[in-house]
């Protein structure tokens, strides 16, 4: 069952949907349904022939989505990395007018102790966005080497004490398995020789483990490639990211596809290369950050960045 009592406020709600430039009878994909904030706003702007396909890999989000009885709406349970696959099954490749992606973990996932995402609330050390698939954080930490753990903490959390924390985790697991979020958070705090002001010592490590367990960065890369594949000419891409690792991927993807294929300079070009030289797939529309008012109302919005792009006519 969905835990509807955990509130979720969609960040940059109006801005992200406005960036899609909704067409009354268009077909849209909300790749991260969550609790449906973006989906409901998109539906409110669609006409009778419009259509919205939502995707989420969290079973709790799927339960919320099932309550929407609008015939223009459909929900798919799965990762957004497969959005091109879902679109192909529906016979809609190249016909999608807009794709919206709201990256990272949602407030209900963070706020529900049973999901195991938060170091602020004690719960089982899980961290899976889809608890029915893959290994939990506790299972991975139990079987991983100190080198593997340190690499994850450094790569996905930019944790300066990654090796020290990793050794402490392995040593603790050899004595007694770490199965609770509070136990892991306390262990990380003890292993961190320097504490940052106004920041829990476990912040970066929890982010890193969560990203690794859910393959979040690979998911984003595949979702962006899929979005480019399914969009119609003039179709819009609207992406909200919440930390630099996510935003770096989105920014690089839009930039690379706005430039077109790179060909060697100063060499005779084939006919195919000449065609490719001027070709580009996306046009960057720009980016936005939340207003001071939104950040004051929802502090989790502080680090968010919204980027827009448009599919170039073929």
UniProtKB/Swiss-Prot annotation:
Organism this protein belongs to: Photorhabdus laumondii subsp. laumondii (strain DSM 15139 / CIP 105565 / TT01)
Superkingdom of the organism of origin: Bacteria
Protein name: Ribosomal RNA small subunit methyltransferase H
Subcellular location: Cytoplasm
One matching Pfam family: Methyltransf_5
Basic and acidic residues composition bias: residue spans: 289-300
EC supergroup of this enzyme: transferase
Region called Disordered, residue ranges: 278-300
Family: Belongs to the methyltransferase superfamily. RsmH family.
Leader sequence segment: none
InterPro entries in the record: RsmH (IPR002903), SAM-dep_MeTrfase_MraW_recog (IPR023397), SAM-dependent_MTases_sf (IPR029063)
């Amino acid at each position: 069952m969905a835990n509807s009592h955990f509130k979720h406020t969609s960040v940059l709600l109006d801005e992200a949907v406005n960036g899609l430039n909704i067409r009354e009878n268009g077909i849209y994909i909300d790749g991260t349904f969550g609790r449906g904030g973006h989906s409901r706003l998109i539906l409110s702007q669609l006409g009778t022939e419009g259509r919205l396909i939502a995707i989420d890999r969290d079973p709790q989000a799927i339960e919320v989505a099932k309550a929407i009885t609008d015939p223009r709406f459909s929900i798919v349970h799965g990762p957004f990395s497969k959005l091109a696959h879902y679109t192909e099954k529906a016979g809609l490749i190249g016909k999608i007018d807009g794709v919206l992606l709201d990256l990272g973990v949602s407030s209900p996932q963070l706020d529900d102790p049973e999901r195991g995402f938060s170091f602020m609330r004690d719960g089982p050390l899980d961290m899976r966005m889809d608890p029915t698939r893959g290994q939990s954080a506790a299972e991975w930490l139990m079987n991983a080497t100190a080198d593997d753990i340190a690499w994850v903490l450094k790569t996905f959390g930019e944790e300066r004490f990654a090796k020290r924390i990793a050794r402490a985790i392995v040593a603790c697991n050899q004595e007694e398995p770490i199965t609770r979020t509070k136990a892991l958070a306390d262990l990380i705090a003890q292993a961190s020789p320097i504490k940052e002001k106004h920041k829990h010592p476990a912040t970066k490590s929890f982010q890193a483990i969560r990203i690794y367990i859910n393959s979040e960065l690979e998911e984003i890369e595949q979702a962006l490639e899929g979005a480019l594949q399914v969009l119609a000419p003039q179709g819009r891409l609207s992406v909200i990211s919440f930390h630099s690792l996510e935003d770096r991927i989105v920014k690089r993807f839009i930039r690379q596809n706005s430039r077109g294929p790179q060909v060697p300079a100063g060499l005779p070009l084939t006919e195919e290369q000449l065609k490719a030289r001027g070709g580009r797939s996306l046009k960057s529309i720009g980016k936005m950050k939340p207003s001071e008012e939104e950040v004051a109302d929802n502090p989790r919005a502080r680090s968010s960045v919204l980027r827009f792009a448009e599919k170039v006519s073929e």
